[in-house]
From Swiss-Prot:
Main location: Golgi
Domain of life assignment: Eukaryota
Name of the protein in its database record: Proton-coupled zinc antiporter SLC30A5
Matches recorded under SUPFAM superfamilies: Cation efflux protein transmembrane domain-like
UniProt source species: Mus musculus (Mouse)
Length: 761
């Protein structure tokens, strides 16, 4: 049922909606035909790029529309089949044709800027992929974590093309090719891209992304019109025909006013026939058939992979002499081009595009199926849902960023980290920009070092946010200990940094290198100013960082007592007690302190080198800084380890000892055993204790007294187990041996005498 009714609403040949059930053997046949069609479309698009070097883009689109209209009108017979087209429908078809011409213009102009490989990667995405992407970005029901991951992959792929693709042929040219400026339209498009301040091929990437979004919106808006006029194929035939009449006057004007670069139009018949058949006709019909025979998500998945792989293969071999025999256009065998070459950035981008297309085209199965496990006493059916059914509805990316930023600014620690992170990033990018501008390797290296320091701030920021997350069924204590882990990891990072700085300093002491100090002083002074701001912001974290550990406390006096009863109760208190360690803030502070010491060391060594020529000053200062970093981080590592090992909090040790003595004096309390106290996070000191009470005592009164005493000692998350004589009698009735009962009572603290003077054995 899911396969049968889960498809696209595109009308089939007979006007029906949705896919139909097809046997698996025939389905495999359609999948193979779809893959072959996509590979041929890649061939046609590479051929189109070669044709556009000689033919004006408007003339090129006109010829494609003319050939497509001729074929579809001949075979579809839109005027003789179906209902007559009304005047209102002709107006809609005219608008449809205008929109189709605009999208084709954007598509093929992007092809001239980016080349066929990048055009295929950017533009050849199914509608369902783009709709899933937009729903993740701009709606609150994006389809769960998997869809969000797919959207992230798509965005990363586009960023790779923009930032890490060295396709700079167009950027290196002093002026645009002459064939592209022979009309006002193309000149206007070039001017718009130049206004963005990016290279032409990067502007082409943005243009193709825009064209892709327009194409998806165009297809979505066309579905109702296709139903009204009698099917998608009839609409396509009529729209292509109207497009020919729209472009015809424009082409005539261009032919009269511009000089053609084509020597013989007859030689282009075969190339144009190849493009028309592979790109326009075969792809359209194959998509229409597959959308009827199988689910639209399968069409998207099976169609995207072959076209992307074909794009990579043709991008590498298209200009190679061995492919000349496969090409319709003649070119000398020795003529090779370096246009839009295959680069590492485009390969990485292709991998991310393939992953994103596979994820975004997959159907969302969240909460679709449940297993009937029975009925309630009232007769209501009970279902068991697995997997994604329990997941929260995903938020859109803008809303998630907005909510996260709001949480960051709500609390003092995360707000300080965020502000300093922004300042650090600003200084980092200014340093990188100035380093690239002046070709200074020192500035660029220091910029990347600052970027690494920002990663520690990001980790601290995430830890500060996660520590405020509410407790869940799985993490019943909440996420407060994330700050301890963050501080511990930051401490380990600093130890590694100190070790490598120490080893490098020792090596340079043996053979001091000569340094270029031209840019060291201004960079170090700028870094020192930034880090001093951080020192002032985070200094409170260091001053409150002492005395925070976690541990456990227990007494063992080996006394044997009479059997006592068992009750059970829990006392909880959740107030804040001071003195706790925020290891996360201490870790951030120590990172900033290390950077500050580094800036001071660079300034001092620069002055000594410039004034006295003491090149040994640089390794000496670095050695001193490495030792200081190591010594300053040891207390953080020690305290964090004690917390993770559940040590008794040192700042509460004396108070807890006094509290246990007070508990012994409570009226009606015989003894206690297994007292355990530890620090869970900066604000939570937890504890558990077993108390043995007389049979006639009121349990809640004892629990309240014990809770009050331990709360005054700093324990704000307490569990108390009350045990009475009936419990031990019950254990004896279950044939519990003497040694088992002794094991339960050997840690009891006894008062030796009850109030009536009876001695307890």
């Amino acid at each position: 049922m899911e396969e049968k009714y889960g498809g696209d609403a595109r009308p089939g040949p007979g006007g029906g909606l949705g896919p139909v059930d097809v046997p698996s053997a025939r389905l495999t046949r359609y999948i193979l035909l779809l893959c072959l069609t996509k590979c041929l479309k890649a061939v046609g698009l590479f051929e189109s790029y070669d044709l556009l070097k000689a033919v004006h883009i408007v003339q090129f689109i006109f010829i494609l529309k003319l050939g497509t209209a001729f074929f579809m009108v001949l075979f579809q017979k839109p005027f003789s089949s179906g209902k007559p087209i009304t005047k209102h429908q002709w107006i809609k078809i005219f608008k449809h044709a205008v929109a189709g011409c605009i999208i084709s213009l954007l598509w093929f102009f992007g092809l001239t800027l980016c080349g066929p490989l990048r055009t295929l990667l950017l533009f050849e995405h199914s509608d369902i992929v783009v709709i899933s992407l937009l729903s993740v970005l701009f709606t609150s029901s994006g389809g769960g974590p998997a869809k969000t991951r797919g959207a992230a992959f798509f965005i990363i792929a586009v960023i790779c093309l923009l930032l890490f693709d060295n396709d700079d042929l167009m950027a290196k040219m002093a002026e645009h090719p002459e064939g592209h400026h022979d009309s006002a339209l193309t000149h206007m498009l070039y001017t718009a891209i130049a206004f963005l301040g990016v290279a032409d091929h990067k502007g082409g990437v943005l243009l193709l992304v825009l064209a892709l979004c327009c194409k998806v919106g165009f297809h979505t808006a066309s579905r109702k019109l296709s139903i009204d006029v009698g099917g998608a194929k009839r609409l396509q035939a009529l729209s292509q025909l109207v497009s020919v009449f729209l472009l015809c006057p424009w082409v005539i004007v261009l032919s009269v006013t511009t000089e053609s670069k084509v020597e013989s139009w007859f030689s282009l018949i075969m190339p144009f026939t190849t493009v028309i058949f592979f790109v326009m006709i075969l792809d359209f019909y194959m998509d229409s058939v597959c959308s009827v025979k199988m689910d639209v998500s399968k069409c998207a998945r099976y169609g995207s992979f072959p076209i992307f792989i074909s794009a990579l293969l043709f991008g590498n071999f298209w200009t190679h002499p061995i492919t000349d025999q496969l090409r319709a256009m003649n070119r000398a065998a020795h003529q090779e081009s370096t246009e839009h070459v295959l680069s590492g950035g485009v390969v990485v981008s292709a991998v991310f595009f393939i992953l994103s297309a596979n994820i975004l085209s997959s159907p969302s199965k969240r909460g679709q199926k449940g297993t009937l496990i029975g009925y309630s006493p009232e007769g209501t059916p009970l279902y068991h849902f697995m997997g994604d059914a329990f997941q929260h509805s995903s938020q859109s990316v803008p809303r998630f960023i907005k909510d996260s930023l709001k949480q960051v600014l709500e609390e003092s620690d995360s707000r300080q980290i965020f502000y300093f992170l922004c300042l650090n990033l600003l200084f980092t990018f200014v340093e990188l920009f100035y380093g690239v501008l002046t070709n200074s390797l020192g500035l660029i290296s220091d910029g990347f070092h600052m970027l690494f320091d920002c990663s520690a701030l990001v980790m601290g920021l995430f830890a500060a946010l996660m520590s405020r997350w509410k407790a869940t069924r799985i993490f019943s204590y909440g996420y407060g200990r994330i700050e301890i882990l963050s501080g511990f990891i930051n401490g380990l990072f600093l130890i590694v940094i100190a070790f490598f700085v120490f080893m490098e300093s020792v090596a340079r002491l043996i053979d001091p290198p000569e340094l270029d100090t031209n840019m060291l002083t201004p960079v170090s002074v700028g870094g020192l100013i930034v880090n001093l701001i951080g020192i002032c912001a985070f200094s409170h974290a260091h001053s409150h960082g002492h005395g925070a550990s976690q541990g456990n406390c227990h007494s063992d006096h080996g006394h044997s007592h009479h059997a006592h009863g068992h009750g059970h109760d829990h006392g909880h208190s959740h107030g804040f007690t001071g003195g706790g360690m925020n290891a996360n803030m201490r870790g951030v502070f120590l990172h900033v302190l290390a950077d500050t010491l580094g800036s001071i060391g660079v300034i001092v060594s620069t002055v000594l080198i410039e004034q006295f020529g003491w090149f040994i000053a640089d390794p000496l200062c670095s050695l001193f800084i490495a030792v200081l970093i190591f010594l300053s981080v040891i207390p953080l590592i020690k305290d964090a380890c004690q917390v993770l090992l559940l040590r008794l909090p040192p700042d509460h040790e004396k108070e807890l000892h006094i509290a246990l003595e007070k508990i012994q004096k409570i009226e009606g309390l015989i003894s206690y055993r297994d007292p355990h106290f530890w620090r869970h996070s900066a604000s939570i000191v937890a504890g558990t204790i077993h108390i043995q009470v007389t049979s006639e005592v009121l349990e809640q009164r004892i629990v309240q007294q014990v809770t009050g005493i331990l709360k005054d000692a700093g324990v704000n998350n307490l569990t108390i187990q009350v045990e009475k004589e009936a419990y031990f009698q019950h254990m004896s009735g279950l044939s519990t041996g003497f040694h088992d009962v002794l094991a339960m009572t050997k840690q009891m603290e006894s008062l030796k005498y009850c109030k009536d003077g009876t001695y307890i054995m």
